[in-house]
């Protein structure tokens, strides 16, 4: 008789403990119900990137002196600089400049060490394509400035995200 009573008491204690755990989990769920959502609806809402965000590289062809500092400081020797030495003025003339963003690690060394500031980082981060060869940008593609997220009227920008409390 006693083993049956103790089993019944253990079953009751386990039931109460399980109900308490379920209640605790439900209270956590309810505490999150009155908070703002953490995620954004990406194609229709975009976050404003910070000032120091390292996105696609912008290149100004007229400022470049073909010194190749960007190639030397790049950890993967990525920028391709084609130039021709003009003997009459004894200066290099830039012919072609290209960067393959399929390989680029966006470290920003080329921008930081450029002596003429012809390279800069933009806020553009949507570089996805169906063909990886489309990620090889020449000086014309690098010279285009991206459309600012703030200026795009089709997208609702998110200025202030709720801060996560730890």
Curated annotation (Swiss-Prot):
PROSITE patterns the record matches: 4FE4S_FER_1, 4FE4S_FER_2
EC number: 7.1.1.-
InterPro entries recorded: 4Fe4S_Fe-S-bd, 4Fe4S_Fe_S_CS, NADH_quinone_OxRdtase_chainI, NDHI
BP terms from Gene Ontology: photosynthesis, light reaction
Reaction equation(s) it catalyzes: a plastoquinone + NADH + (n+1) H(+)(in) = a plastoquinol + NAD(+) + n H(+)(out); a plastoquinone + NADPH + (n+1) H(+)(in) = a plastoquinol + NADP(+) + n H(+)(out)
Cofactors that this protein relies on: [4Fe-4S] cluster
Name under which the protein is recorded: NAD(P)H-quinone oxidoreductase subunit I, chloroplastic
Lineage per the UniProt record: Eukaryota, Viridiplantae, Streptophyta, Embryophyta, Tracheophyta
Gene name of the record: ndhI
């Amino acid at each position: 008789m006693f083993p049956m009573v103790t089993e019944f008491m253990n079953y009751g204690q386990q039931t109460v403990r399980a109900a308490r755990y379920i209640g605790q989990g439900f209270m956590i769920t309810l505490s999150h119900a009155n908070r703002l959502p953490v995620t954004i609806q990406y194609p229709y809402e975009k976050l404003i990137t910070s000032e120091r965000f390292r996105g696609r590289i912008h290149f100004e062809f007229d400022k470049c002196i073909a010194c190749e500092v960007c190639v030397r400081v790049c950890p993967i020797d990525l920028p391709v600089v084609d130039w021709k030495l003009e003997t009459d003025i004894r200066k290099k003339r830039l012919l072609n400049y290209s960067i393959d963003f399929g390989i680029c690690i966006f470290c920003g060394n080329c921008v930081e060490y450029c002596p003429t500031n012809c390279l800069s980082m933009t806020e553009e981060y949507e570089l996805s394509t169906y063909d990886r060869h489309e990620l090889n940008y020449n000086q014309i593609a690098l010279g285009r400035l991206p459309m600012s997220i703030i200026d795009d009227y089709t997208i609702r920008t998110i200025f202030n995200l709720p801060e996560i409390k730890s």
